[in-house]
């Protein structure tokens, strides 16, 4: 735990360490690192969900908590509410004829299919976020295919979701996720036979 805190929490700028929302994002990164590397190398380490992991960190380093609120559960709840409003950006990767597009499937047992996308980082532009998330999830640099003005954007319960339309990807492209324990499947789907998981996006690209 000390090594994780030194890597992700203790040496970050004060602007992030003193802001509980930003600090929680760093704790989330530390939690992913714990799952992806520490527990893979040492099976005896306990499995911990984020709330339990955060509680252990705050117990070991109570000086990390700033402000009037000291309840870990409330801090996590506030952070989760904030995350719901963070915009997400990604891409609809299509072949040259625009008859097929790429979908990804999460790693959980009941994961559905979706377009590669993710939450924007602080001070990150929408198009850079989209390119970064796509590269992480499918291992493909979509930047050369991206037109900053060509996108579909929907507001889902107060959260902006934008997908850039990126035609021109060869169907023979080999996609390999750069993530760990996040993406289980990457597959081309015919646009006229997409799963009905996101009607606003599906209807927009099918017309």
Question: Where would I find each of the regions flagged by the language model?
Answer:
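Long, compositionally biased charged/polar stretches
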Residues: 196-199
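Short, intrinsically disordered, charge-balanced linker/junction segments flanking boundaries
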Residues: 201-207
